[in-house]
Amino acid sequence: MKKIAKIGILALLAMVTLTPVFAGGKADSGSKKGGLIKVGIVNLPPEESGYRQANVEDMNNVFSKANGYDAKQTNTGDNSEQIAAAQGYIRDGVDCLLISAANASGWDNVLQSAKKAGVKVFLFDRLIDTDPSNYQAALVSDMKTEGNTAMNWVLGQKLSKINLILIRGQLGSAAELGRSAAALAAKDAGKITIVADGTGGDSWSLEEARKVVEAAIVAGKDFNVIYAENDGMAQGAVQALDAAGITHGKNGKVKVLGFDFNRFALRNVQAGYWDCDIQCSPRQAGEISKWIKSGTLPSGIVFQKEIFADTASITDDIIKNFGLNDDPGKGVITK
């Protein structure tokens, strides 16, 4: 682990929970022999972030008619609207229901309805707070480990004090809960001080994140770390720093950390404009499709392999192979 930390990249190993989820089970291969597999996808809106844009596109590309699917995707950040969409897909007689939940709670009834109807439920991106027997399998990011990776990086900077601004994502989402937990645990252990605790709201808004930092500056808060739970919010936070003339990045006063691995964010890290970015891979569709078509399911919750990169470890290959969305180009800073 120490060796990996020195180069700034930590592989978050793919893990399987000890609780079996239909171990060795078989998934149906379609509504009828030789027909298209009917799939309902409940997801968040692509406007939420660069991560979500890539995730929505991945789902659309994989679950296409060309690949043997009759799929529809609903995109909303409202949990009640997501639940209503899931209920609609069940009534429509889908074979499989894929869910990335806006909020981790409130899903028991619809999941139990899916089970009674014989609909296979696959979670992606985020876990739901429910009994594992209520879904078939899951392929998700380990948000808690992402948060621990980020906080270990912060603590490893050997700052004389750590006064941190925490900018959370959508409150109650699996991503927010996991990533925030590490910062809150470090605070409770007396390792850091959280001088401002805000959120980008349900849309993980750049503008709302900027307001959190602007308010901290106006209030005279002394801070030296921005812990923003996605790249867009990190961008908004840095806009506030720039407007106030506060230095940041590799040689600046304030360390800036984001999540998701958008290529613009990685180029900012490479340029020393930001300090660190944590990967959260949006590409789950291909693996779930393999599960469905093969009929062979994993024995539990599968966590994706993910990495992080800082100014000491970032390379063009990392940006090319792991980054999301358009690449602004080497040396280009996105403000």
Briefly describe each language-model feature range.
Residues 91-116, 183, 198-267:
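Hydrophobic alpha-helical
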Residues 36-88, 94, 100-104, 167-178, ...:
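Extracytoplasmic "Venus flytrap"
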Residues 105-145, 163, 261-270:
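Flexible loop/hinge segments that line or gate small-molecule binding clefts
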Residues 39, 82, 138-164, 178, ...:
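Hydrophobic alpha-helical segments within soluble ligand-binding/sensing domains
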